[in-house]
Each structure stands twice: as C-alpha cells, then as structure tokens.
Curated annotation (Swiss-Prot):
It comes from Mus musculus. Coiled coil: none annotated. GO terms for cellular component: endoplasmic reticulum membrane. Its EC number is 1.1.1.209, 1.1.1.53, 1.1.1.105. CDD domains: type2_17beta_HSD-like_SDR_c. This is Dehydrogenase/reductase SDR family member 9.
Length: 319
C-alpha cells in the first residue's frame, strides 16, 4: 500500500513538473508592456525579454532611464515615459500602445513600478506619509491595468503583478505594506474576473532584494527627516539613539538580501511563457524559507519573531 502511495505521489510530482515546462510558441509576434523600467527588476526584465525576442514596450519614469535602456537593447524595444500616478499620462500611453500593437493586442502586462515610501513607526507618521506608495503601488497599478486590459483580453494574454512579502506580512509602518496587501486583493479578484476571457493573472512576491527601493541609507534619511519634526514626547519615548540603532539593525538585516534580480525576472518569464502559469510566484531564499512560511503561522508567533527585530524603545511609558 505504501509503495503505491509513494508511486502516486512521484507520478503527480512528475506530471506537475512536466506541465510547468510546457511553453508557448511564436514569441516574436507577442508584445509585452512593462512598467518601472528605469532600474531594478523592470530594467532587467525589459533587457531579458528583448533578448528572448519579445516585442517589449518599456515604460520609464525618466528620460535618462529611457535613454540608458535603449542603449542596451535592440531596435525591437520601444520606451515610453510614464508616471503611473498621472491618469492622463496613463490614458495617452494606453492609446499609443493600442495603435502600436494593432490587432495582435498585448500578450503581457507586467505591473512592476513601485516605491517604498516612508518606513517608520506608525505614530511618527501623518496620512500624507502613506499617500505616495499607495498612489504608485496600488492606484497606479490599477489604473494601468484598467487601461491596458482590453488589449490583453484581445490577445488572451497575461497580467503579472509584482507584489511583495510585504503583501503577506506587515514589517513596518507606512504606506508600503498596506499598498501591497491591497495589490494581493486586486490581483485575486482580477484573476477570477479574467478567467472566462482566457487571460491568466499571476502575482509575484519577492523577498528582500538589493535594489534602489531597499537602500538602507535612503530609508534612514527619510526616517531622520521625520524624526526632526517629532514632538518632544515622541522623541522621549523612542530615545535619541533610536535612529542610529535602527540603521544598524537595518544594515544587519539587509546584509543577507538577495543579490540575484534574475530570480524575480525568472518568475516573470515563466508567467509569460508557460502554457500553465502559476497563480503565485515566490522569489528569493528569504521569502521561501522565512517570510511566506511565517505568513501562515498564528499571529502570536508572527508578532514574537518580528518584534525581536525591532529596536527597543528608551521609555515607552513616557506618555
């Protein structure tokens, strides 16, 4: 009995692996639109998919980012300047993409653009500190999707939303984790709505990677700017050495970040080219071995482990 059970499990694993290796054909006539291509995951994705033969349309925020990307890619790749928080800019870009791709439609939409915003204790913040990451990571992603969706439906293509382990666990105050939690919800509802149209929707959840978004120095500079304007009561509660201690803790945590950005781009590649793309992709050793498993644990265990990473307050009773 045990033998047959093991044989069945082996067969299921083999078939699952085989199914995941089946690829689409005719990449050369398929268009892919990627946001956030100035640096990081988006930049590497644009270069990678251009080399594979896709017709890439790379959305950059800056002229310099666009020029640098063009210099490293083929004539197939086109760049557009796009601020995902500007509705008129998004609308005009979608109109241009529609005229560019014609009847072929858009095989892939990769929503990659994102910002970290301010990462600081919640009682340091104002509602304005939450706006930027929510505007970019959530409303920008939704607006781009809604404008490009008719083209994706025409091609019966793919939508790939880059979320984060911050969409599974809230590891700090600010707008980043609320925005990513919301992206997860939008992704799931979109996936179910698009099922009948033959459109596959996938979500990528990267761990901590060495990108501009995760720069510990920039994160600390933003935190320090807020600290200077805090009330004396808040400063007394946290202590004058809090910023330095949190920077030291942040640097020690980021010393083990993932350096290989291709781990995320590889997930994008599978979601674009597999006949049977996954609904979710987990990228990075830390995400697979710590963050995602922890997200399934009871809240009391999550709190215990995450609070161990926090800097101890000088005088929390001084309220």
């Amino acid at each position: 009995m045990l033998f047959w059970l093991l044989a069945l499990l082996f067969l299921c694993a083999f078939l699952w692996n085989y199914k995941g290796q089946l690829k689409i054909a005719d990449i050369a006539d398929k268009y892919v639109f990627i946001t956030g291509c100035d640096t990081g995951f988006g930049n590497l994705a644009a270069r990678t998919f251009d080399k594979k033969g896709f017709r890439v349309i790379a959305a950059c925020l800056t002229e310099s980012g666009s020029a640098a990307l063009k210099a490293k890619t083929s004539e197939r790749l086109h760049t557009v300047l796009l601020d995902v928080t500007d509705p008129e800019n998004v609308k005009k870009t979608a109109q241009w993409v529609k005229s560019h791709v014609g009847e072929k439609g858009l095989w892939g939409l990769i929503n990659n653009a994102g910002v970290l915003g301010v990462l600081a204790p919640t009682d340091w913040l104002t509602v304005d500190d939450y706006r930027e990451p929510i505007e970019v990571n959530l409303f920008g992603l939704i607006n781009v999707t809604l404008n490009m969706l008719p083209l994706v439906k025409k091609a019966r293509g793919r939508v790939i939303n880059v979320s984060s382990i911050g969409g599974r666990l809230a590891f700090g105050g600010g707008g980043y984790t609320p925005s990513k939690y919301a992206v997860e919800g939008f992704n799931d509802s979109l996936r179910r709505d698009m099922k009948a149209f033959g459109v596959h929707v996938s979500c990528i959840e990267p761990g901590l990677f060495k990108t501009e978004l995760a720069d510990p120095i920039k994160t600390t500079e933003k935190k320090l700017a807020i600290w200077k304007h805090l009330s004396p009561d808040i400063k007394q509660q946290y202590g004058e050495g809090y910023i330095e201690k949190s920077l030291h803790r942040l640097k020690s945590n980021t010393s083990s970040v993932n350096l290989d950005l291709s781990l995320v781009v590889g997930c994008m590649d599978h979601a674009l080219t597999s006949l049977f793309p996954k609904t979710r992709y987990i990228a990075g050793k830390d995400a697979k071995t710590f963050w995602i498993p922890l997200s399934h644990m009871p809240a009391v265990l999550q709190d215990f482990l995450l609070l161990k990473q926090k800097v101890e307050l000088a005088n929390p009773k001084a309220v």
